[in-house]
Structure formats: C-alpha cells, structure tokens
From Swiss-Prot:
It is linked to Roifman-Chitayat syndrome: An autosomal recessive digenic disorder characterized by global developmental delay, variable neurologic features such as seizures and ataxia, optic atrophy, dysmorphic facial features, distal skeletal anomalies, and recurrent invasive infections due to combined immunodeficiency. The lineage of its organism: Eukaryota, Metazoa, Chordata, Craniata, Vertebrata. It comes from Homo sapiens. Induction: Degraded at the end of mitosis. Down-regulated upon exposure to nitric oxide. It is found in: Nucleus; Chromosome, Centromere, Kinetochore; Cytoplasm, Cytoskeleton, Spindle pole; Cytoplasm, Cytoskeleton, Microtubule organizing center. This is Small kinetochore-associated protein.
Amino acid sequence: MAAPEAPPLDRVFRTTWLSTECDSHPLPPSYRKFLFETQAADLAGGTTVAAGNLLNESEKDCGQDRRAPGVQPCRLVTMTSVVKTVYSLQPPSALSGGQPADTQTRATSKSLLPVRSKEVDVSKQLHSGGPENDVTKITKLRRENGQMKATDTATRRNVRKGYKPLSKQKSEEELKDKNQLLEAVNKQLHQKLTETQGELKDLTQKVELLEKFRDNCLAILESKGLDPALGSETLASRQESTTDHMDSMLLLETLQEELKLFNETAKKQMEELQALKVKLEMKEERVRFLEQQTLCNNQVNDLTTALKEMEQLLEM
C-alpha cells in the first residue's frame, strides 16, 4: 500500500455559512423588546464575535501552513471547532431557565480555551500525514459527543423542570396542612385561655370571700382574748376569765339563795291565798243564805196578808 499523495498547495477547503440576514419587517411604533429578547441578542452578538476571532486565528494558522511545503490545509478542522465553540457558547437559557449574564460570559471564556488546544492536536495529526478519513472520523465523533452531551443536559434539565411542580405542589400541600393544624391549635388555645380566665375570675372572687371571713374570725378571736397565731389564751385573758368566773360563781350562789327565799315566800302566800279562798267561800254562802232568808220572809209576809184578807172577806 502506497501512502496517499498530498493534495496541491493551491487547493483550499471553504465552507459557506447560511445567510443569517433576514428580510426586515417593519415593526409598529408601540413595539417594545422584552428583557429576555435583549439578553438573547447580546449573547448572540458575543458568540458571533468569538466565532469571528477564531476564524481569523485559524486563517492565520492556515496561511503559515500554506507557506510550509507538503502540509495540508486545516480549514475544515477550524470550521468544525468554530461550530463547537458556537454551540458551546449558545445561551443556556434556550435549554433551561435563563442564567445571569456573568455566568454566561464565564462559560464562553472557558469554552474558548480547550477548543484551541483541540485545534492544535488535530493540526498535529494533519501535519503528521494522516489520511483525510481520520479527520472526518474525529470531527464526526466530536460532533456526536457534543450532541449526546447536549441531549443529556437537555433531558436532565427537562426532568428537573418536570419534577419542580410536583415538589412545589407537595410543599404547598404540606404548608396548607400545617396552616390548618396551626389554626386548629390556635382555636383550642383560645378556648383554653377563655376557660382559664373564667376560672381565674371565680377563684379571685372565692379568695376575696375567704379573706373577708378570715378577717371576721380574727376580730372575734381578738375580742375573746384568744391568740389566733398560737391558738391559746393570753395571760391577761386568762386573768380576766378567772375573775369573771369568780364573779359568775358568786352571782350564782346569791341567785340560788334568793330563789330559795322566793320559794318559801311563795309557799306561804299560797297557803294564805287558800285560807282567803275558804273565807271568801264562807262569806258567799252567808250572803246567799241571807238572801234566801229574806226571800222566805217576804213570802211569809205576803201569805199572812193574803190570809187576813180572806178572813175579812169570809166574815162579811
């Protein structure tokens, strides 16, 4: 097998990009760009500038390669690397939620560095005299790897997006349940507070009544000469109680003697009353007898007068 001949130096691979210019359509005067449109336009401008710089660098490298004899051009490899850089510089907001501009610029600056190293490796392989089929295989593998990575990242982000609403719904449901539980607990606490307040009012009233009763009891004990703290009588109260007891005993003795005398006098008076009663009865009997006697005498006189009158009538 003979080694493949190198192509002539004047042959150059050129790729034509699709025209990005679009027909200008007139916009209404009230048209206003949204914030995400302005961010996308800025990112697209940044990617085109980066791609242009890479193309210029690749053209310079290819110019130096053309000057060296027996070296193939590297236009195709640089174009594939530019495509990769443009794909890597696309805004991640197109695949998932938009990120801030600082992170996007950092991603673009980081993605530019390894691309140049890849270009150098591929150019080394080309300078070493490898066949063109190897170059196409490498470019295809890189494209497939980039597409697979992009699809993996897109699917992961889509899965994350799909799971977010479920987690939000769960969190909202949990929050609602917690709020309902808290409301029920608050109601129970309010009820307990009202009940305890009512019990406190009742207890305060009972305490006030007990304090009044205690004050009355203390006043009574002090009036009787009792010590409420010790629960015993004091010396002065004891002396007073002894004197009072002696006085009461003397009074009792005198009362007993007086009662005895009263009983004796009462007995005598009863006897006298009975004698008076007998005398009164005798007097009453005498009065009755005298009255009857007078009545009898009057009747006798009447009868004698009547007899005299009858005798006179008979004599006539």
